């Protein structure tokens, strides 16, 4: 199943605390 959370977790901005 596709999860938008999985996409955000792979993005650099996620590590910034988004």
Swiss-Prot record:
Its main location: secreted. One of its GO terms (cellular component) is extracellular region. The modification Leucine amide is found at residue 18. It is found in: Secreted. Keywords: Amidation, Neuropeptide, Secreted. GO terms for biological process: neuropeptide signaling pathway. Belongs to the allatostatin family. This is Cydiastatin-2. It comes from Cydia pomonella.
């Amino acid at each position: 199943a596709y999860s938008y959370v999985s996409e955000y977790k792979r993005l650099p901005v996620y590590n910034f605390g988004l």
